[in-house]
């Protein structure tokens, strides 16, 4: 037993030693593996597999070398100097474009074009230059026949007017057309350095098995014999590869997305699989994809900007606008015909209150699939709009440009009036004749139309339920929009021509008022668009159209020339078109029919042109500028356009009672107009011969007085002068019975409180001036010293009896205070003389019996003559005052 146990212990000890030695030898082998070179893999493969056939080993070695030559090498040794690859690719591409532009400028015609464009380039802002660089890159990257159209550019940039898209688009097309034919990558040093190695690799031939394997894996355009390719094709291929590899580096990151979507990166990486490809082959260039990154949409407000929407980006893909390159793509584009304006609708409704739109491509696809499931029936394609040509699809020729253009665009000419529209899935313009039935209310608005795209509009509304609910919420939140319209409401027109109050005579212009929901209208920009009026989403307008737009107005005097004119207002309405989908636009809506009076502003200037002065008894300007011929500014009166008989009373106000003047002082709208007598005064207002000295020197600077007296012929009273003398002239006994007022300085104050019994005295001073000298004769007898001074100043050459001056200077106390004023005040304003000569200020004088030189019943013949100048009157008044003071 003991021997067996000893043998067992020895066995386990030996086993432990063997295991220990094995472990030690294993660690040394691991240390040797740290220095193993995997590059020398041929010997290891031969030893492992124990290949006996040397020829098969050589073939396998050649195949592996060929496979390595066609593999993409991602291992870059940073220590190895490569001067041709140290510079950024953008610098090389910039140099290529610069060299091409320098060659293009050798042409005299192109130099002339760029000379005209250079001033515009200097004045462009930073955003406009970024847009220009983006368009230049887009047009240079695009294949022939796939260039961007102006409609696509407008949708990409949001149709912002600040970017000057038409000018920037033309400049980009000019640069593309002038430099593209001069770009030769084979001759350029930079391009040869970039493309020298890939071209040598393409010369390697593929075995049939490798080419078949590459075709099965999805490699495009495998060429087994690339040496037979012509030089022109090689040049075109290099040009396409050059612009394909330019990518987004040429485009500014502020205008174009800095990083492409993940799908594009995955597609590029899946195309080149080093473990499956036998050789790197030339692949055809992909369709041009231009994605515009807008950090903040145009419809986002400042509140939403602060709320966090500014950090989200919306990418607009314009691949749907270009012509597909295969039949499968055409089928996909035809099945998804609404993709073009649906994306534009997403941008348009991004700024509505409480609206969230999916920003990723997957979420958009899910939303479109859900909306397609809800609408089981396929939506038909909408009809084209009726409008004139507004945007030119082709490149606009610059001044001096030849008719021949390198880019030929297809145009469809039609004798009918129409505008070519760019379809969503094709670049070919389609012209539709404007022969659709339309119930027009005006030339720019249709109440009903046969081509109303009801299904398309309803589909857009269903796709944007949140946005439409936000619109309805904003509508119902307003206090005046709580009215619910029934579904059976169509539109109605009033039975009357115009809504009028009871008892009114009617409108001055006949018009038709209609409450309707129009279906199509021309926007303020000149484009015909459909107005959303479907289901619960209605937009009712009050429309009023003149029945006789150019005819004269009714209920207006025949002396006025007038005409009826249509008045328009601008309304913001939710509209729909094929390009943009649902959006808000501005429309010109007829809302009123107005009566316009011709020449009214010329004859009656507005109140702003006349300095408004309040009438008050203490106003020195009003009191000193009154004469017997003051009138009323009829444009300030509410009854200025009444009959001519009423105007007679307005021109003869009551100076004793001053009742009308009290109305003037209390009203801000009515003022007294105080013109002087001009040379065009009618004969019934002309003063007598001797009174011309008193009134002839007052020349008013107001132009409205001349306009007033120029129309005196139609406002002349119907009574004759003899009738006026008998009716308006008081008797001498009546004048004797008038008690004189106590003081002159209280004259204006007492006039406001004078009873109605003194009404005839008001007409006494507004009767024809032939009777006024009756009261002016007696002071000549009391003070005969005045006659030799004033006799030579008379204007009449041979009057029957000399006209004495007025005896205003004989009034005690208050007149002497006026006489002691300095002499320059007398010449400063002729209105002060008018205050002393005003007949209304002379009724307080005691009546005097006329002398035997002048009889009460004697009349003098009326002889109008031109008034004298104001200098003679001032001189006469000055001498009269000097003698009265003495």
Curated annotation (Swiss-Prot):
GO cellular component: extracellular region; extracellular space
UniProt-listed InterPro entries: Cystine-knot_cytokine, NT_N, Spaetzle, Spz/Toll_ligand-like
Bias-annotated ranges (Low complexity): 698-710
Record: glycosylation sites: 267, 317, 353, 623
Signal sequence extent: 1-29
Keywords in alphabetical order: Disulfide bond, Glycoprotein, Signal
SUPFAM superfamilies: Cystine-knot cytokines
Tissue expression from the record: Detected in the fan-shaped body which is a component of the locomotion center in the central nervous system (CNS) (at protein level). Expressed in the optic lobes and brain.
Function statement: Neurotrophin which may function as a ligand for the Toll-related receptors Toll-7 and Tollo. Binds to Toll-7 and probably acts as its ligand in promoting motor axon targeting and neuronal survival in the central nervous system (CNS). Involved in synaptic targeting of ISNb/d motorneurons and also some SNa motorneurons. In larvae, involved in the negative regulation of the tracheal immune response to bacterial infection perhaps by acting as a ligand for the Toll-related receptor Tollo. May be involved in the normal development of specific neurons at the neuromuscular junction.
Species: Drosophila melanogaster
Record-annotated disulphide pairs: 509-564, 546-593, 553-595
Pro residues: compositionally biased ranges: 797-807
Additional note from the record: 'Spaetzle' means 'noodles' in German.
Proregion positions: 30-498
A GO BP entry: innate immune response
Name of this chain's protein: Neurotrophin 1
Subunit structure and binding partners: Homodimer; disulfide-linked.
Stretches with biased composition (Basic residues): 815-827, 874-886
Highest rank taxon of the organism: Eukaryota
Protein's UniProt keywords contain Phosphoprotein: no
Region annotation (Disordered) ranges: 321-340, 369-436, 675-754, 789-886
Chain ranges of the Spaetzle domain: 508-597
Keyword Nucleotide-binding: no
Site label Cleavage, positions: 498-499
GO molecular function ontology, one term from the record: growth factor activity
């Amino acid at each position: 037993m003991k021997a067996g146990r000893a043998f067992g212990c020895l066995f386990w000890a030996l086993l432990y030693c063997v295991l220990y030695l094995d472990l030690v030898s294993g660690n040394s082998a691991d240390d040797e593996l740290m220095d193993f070179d995997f590059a020398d893999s041929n010997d290891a493969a031969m030893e492992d597999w124990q290949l006996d056939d040397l020829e098969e080993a050589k073939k396998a070695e050649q195949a592996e070398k060929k496979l390595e030559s066609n593999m993409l090498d991602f291992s870059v040794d940073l220590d190895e100097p490569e001067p041709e690859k140290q510079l950024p690719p953008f610098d090389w591409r910039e140099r290529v474009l610069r060299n091409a532009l320098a060659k293009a400028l050798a042409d005299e015609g192109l130099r002339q074009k760029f000379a005209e464009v250079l001033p515009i380039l200097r004045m462009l802002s930073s955003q406009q230059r970024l847009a220009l660089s983006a368009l230049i890159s887009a047009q240079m990257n695009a294949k022939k026949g796939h260039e961007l159209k102006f409609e696509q550019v407008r949708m990409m940039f949001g149709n912002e007017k600040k970017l000057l898209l038409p000018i920037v688009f033309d400049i980009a097309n000019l640069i593309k057309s002038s430099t593209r034919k001069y770009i030769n990558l084979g001759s350029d040093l930079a391009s040869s350095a970039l493309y020298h190695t890939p071209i040598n690799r393409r010369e390697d031939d593929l075995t049939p098995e490798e080419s078949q394997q590459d075709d099965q894996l999805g490699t495009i355009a495998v060429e087994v014999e690339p040496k037979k390719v012509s030089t022109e094709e090689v040049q075109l291929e290099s040009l396409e590869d050059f612009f394909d590899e330019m990518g987004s580096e040429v485009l500014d990151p502020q205008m174009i997305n800095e990083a492409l979507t993940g799908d594009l990166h995955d597609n590029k990486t899946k195309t080149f699989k080093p473990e499956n490809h036998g050789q790197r082959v030339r692949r055809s260039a992909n369709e041009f994809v231009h994605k515009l990154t807008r950090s903040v949409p145009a419809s986002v407000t400042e509140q939403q900007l602060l709320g966090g929407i500014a950090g989200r980006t919306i990418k607009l893909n314009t691949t749907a606008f270009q012509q597909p390159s295969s039949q499968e793509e055409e089928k996909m584009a035809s099945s998804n015909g609404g993709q073009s304006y649906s994306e534009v609708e997403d941008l348009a409704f991004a700024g509505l209150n409480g609206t969230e739109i999916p920003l990723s491509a997957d979420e958009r696809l899910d939303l479109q699939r859900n909306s397609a499931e809800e609408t089981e029936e396929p939506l038909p394609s909408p009809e084209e709009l009726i409008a004139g040509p507004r945007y030119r699809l082709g490149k606009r020729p610059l001044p001096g440009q030849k008719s021949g253009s390198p880019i030929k665009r297809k145009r469809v000419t039609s004798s009918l009036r129409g505008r070519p529209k760019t379809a969503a899935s094709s670049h070919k313009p389609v012209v539709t004749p404007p022969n659709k039935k339309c119930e027009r209310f005006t030339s720019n608005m249709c109440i009903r139309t046969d081509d109303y795209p009801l299904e398309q509009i309803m589909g857009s509304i269903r796709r944007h339920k949140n946005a439409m609910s936000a619109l309805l919420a904003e509508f119902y939140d307003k206090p005046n929009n709580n009215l619910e319209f029934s579904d059976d409401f169509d539109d109605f027109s009033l039975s009357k021509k115009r809504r009028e109050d009871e008892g009114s005579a009617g409108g001055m212009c006949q018009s038709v008022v209609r409450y309707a929901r129009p279906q199509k209208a021309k926007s303020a920009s000149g484009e015909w668009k459909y107005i959303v009026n479907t289901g619960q989403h209605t937009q009712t307008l009050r429309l009023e159209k003149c029945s006789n737009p150019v005819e004269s107005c009714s209920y207006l005097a025949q002396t006025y020339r007038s005409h009826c004119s249509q008045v328009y207002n601008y309304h913001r309405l939710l509209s729909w078109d094929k390009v943009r989908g649902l959006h808000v636009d501005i429309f010109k809506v007829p809302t009123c029919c107005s009566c316009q009076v011709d020449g009214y502003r010329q004859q009656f200037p507005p109140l702003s042109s006349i300095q408004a002065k309040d009438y008050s008894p203490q106003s020195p300007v009003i009191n000193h500028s009154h004469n017997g011929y003051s009138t009323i500014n009829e444009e300030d009166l509410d009854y200025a356009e009444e009959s001519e008989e009423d105007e007679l009373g307005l021109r003869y106000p009551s100076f004793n009672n001053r009742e009308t003047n009290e109305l003037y002082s209390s009203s801000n709208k009515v003022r007294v107009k105080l013109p002087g007598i001009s040379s065009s005064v009618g004969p019934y207002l002309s003063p007598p011969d001797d009174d011309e000295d008193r009134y002839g020197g007052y020349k008013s600077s107001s132009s409205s007085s001349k306009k007033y007296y120029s129309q005196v012929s139609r406002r002349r009273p119907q009574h004759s002068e003899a009738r006026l003398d008998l009716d308006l002239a008081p008797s001498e006994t009546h004048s004797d019975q008038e008690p004189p007022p106590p003081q002159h300085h209280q004259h204006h104050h007492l006039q406001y409180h004078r009873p109605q019994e003194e009404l005839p005295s008001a007409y006494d001073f507004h009767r024809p001036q032939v009777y006024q000298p009756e009261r002016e004769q007696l002071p000549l007898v009391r003070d005969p010293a005045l006659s030799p001074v004033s006799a030579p100043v008379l204007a009449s050459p041979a009057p029957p009896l000399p006209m004495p001056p007025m005896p205003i200077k004989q009034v005690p106390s208050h007149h002497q205070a006026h006489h002691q004023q300095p002499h320059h005040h007398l010449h400063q304003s002729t209105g002060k003389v008018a205050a002393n000569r005003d007949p209304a200020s002379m009724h307080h004088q005691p009546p005097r019996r006329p002398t035997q030189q002048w009889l009460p019943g004697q009349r003098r013949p009326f002889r109008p003559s031109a008034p004298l100048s104001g200098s003679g009157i001032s001189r006469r008044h000055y001498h009269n005052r000097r003698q009265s003071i003495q």
